[in-house]
């Protein structure tokens, strides 16, 4: 079910009977308030302007409110300096101060502390600061970009999102401004860990360990006991990154066991074989400057903002570039990881696993594999034309409305190519799905399943599938999913995986499954970086660089509630579609 992050107050903008207003129809009091102008949600055409009307209804009460930041004399209130610090320090949250006119507002507030501005200038300053603080809180909670522009679609039901204007007003009134920021933070536990890592890596910007390049390796690689001119610099970098407990007191002359252990820690955090040998890949990873890692962490934080935390008591995530599945328990917002395993995802070249979410509804043991028509036409039929014996060797058969056939004839092959027949693989040891699949119905035919080739899980990079997700420990996941059905014991699960015919177990409650894309992850208290195998970080980075509506260049008087609708400026390059949050 699609859902949109709209506060209850805004929903009251829907006319009786739920009819959605068309753009330009009469609305409630206000035109687009400054805090909403240019927001991608407002520019929707697919939903007939209904969502825009809801947001406008939310803006009007805020526009009519008393000044938040200035007292009756036009002087800044106690919370004003803290609000300005949020904007000027936005980089600490992976955001950009220039997006919130931080420098100009900081100067204006400093001037107002020295001398009260005119009433018109005070009104403009208060409105501008309110607009930018709310933009900051909204970006902090929901992200800066339309998810559709980064090829992601998430529809899972979530807990109600905070009404940020109300939260802000109450926080200012109670003298607890920090409550507003806490309410706006994304609910993913991972977010706080990434934010701490971001602050640390930002502190390394001018660290002397990156002041000079590491020299070439002797013989192309460095092993235990060898000498190398870069050892002291290596030790300094590893210490700064947290892999080496403390930097050596004296110059390092040999690659000893302490340094080797630190390198193994570094390698395991950077998706490299943790063998302690420094080769080209490890040297390249060591050469990445902290600023590049800061950007990588910031992109991971942005993706968490764009990804809804499911309200369901249990959910599963697959982090595609990390090749990792995690199963979580959600107890009223307190999220705990129960299970983690390696996975294989779609090939980066041509069969990428899409980024979306869907509910798992049942498990099928000993499944048939109904070969997708595209795979049958491109791969299976050409193979059968060359080697008709391949059908029997792989336990396959032709299926049509008239029945099942195992005859590899030109007529049957032509029927498959024409879409009049399909090929399926019977349950058994050669079945491409292994002996179990976890069904999450979707129009992309993506699901989780086992594999007859478990040896691939030992690879560091694991993008080998046609798009579905192959899981390493299917029994453990089945037990976790069926936890509320005690009759499904481990023995019964394993027995069902060896049947000659499919066996189905329906879930009592749907389990959301989310396909994520995080190249920076905190796992077990350690920050891990993984390669951008699908190039999606570059896509998000490009979207974030798109211009936003320009802030006012000068301080001018404003009307708090405009009397007539004003055009909403479109953000350059943005999509007109609404993506469900």
Place the predicted regions along the sequence by residue.
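Cationic-aromatic interfacial patches
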Residues: 65-160
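N-terminal signal peptide c-region/cleavage motif recognized by signal peptidases
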Residues: 59-62
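Intrinsically disordered, low-complexity segments enriched in Ser/Pro/Gly/Ala and basic residues
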Residues: 27, 43, 127, 574-576
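Sec-dependent N-terminal signal peptides
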Residues: 46-55
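Well-ordered beta-sheet/strand-loop patches within structured domains
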Residues: 2, 154-162, 169-581
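N-terminal secretory signal peptides that target proteins for export/translocation
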Residues: 1-44
